[in-house]
Amino acid sequence: PVSYYMDLNYTLIIDPKLDFDGSVYYIAYYKELEGLEGVGSTKELALKDLKQVKKDWFRLSLKIGAVIPEPQTKEELNEHSD
C-alpha cells in the first residue's frame, strides 16, 4: 500500500536556487527517487509539493506494477560516498 512507502525514510535534499529575477526558490527531492521534485518559494512549500508528487507517483507505480526503490541504509550511503 501507498502508506508503507510514504512512511519510509528516504534521503531528503532541499536545494536553494536563484530565479531569473534574483528571487530564491527551493527544489526538494529524494536521493533514491530519481525524477521526483517538489518546488516552492520556501523549504516548507517545496517539501509539501514533493510529498504530494511522491504520493501520486507511488500510487501510479503500484497500479502499473513498477518497482519502487526503498531508502538506502547508512551503510549503503557510506559505501557510495567513497
Predicted regions and their residues:
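Short, charged, surface-exposed hinge/linker loops at domain edges
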Residues: P1-I13, E44, K48-D82
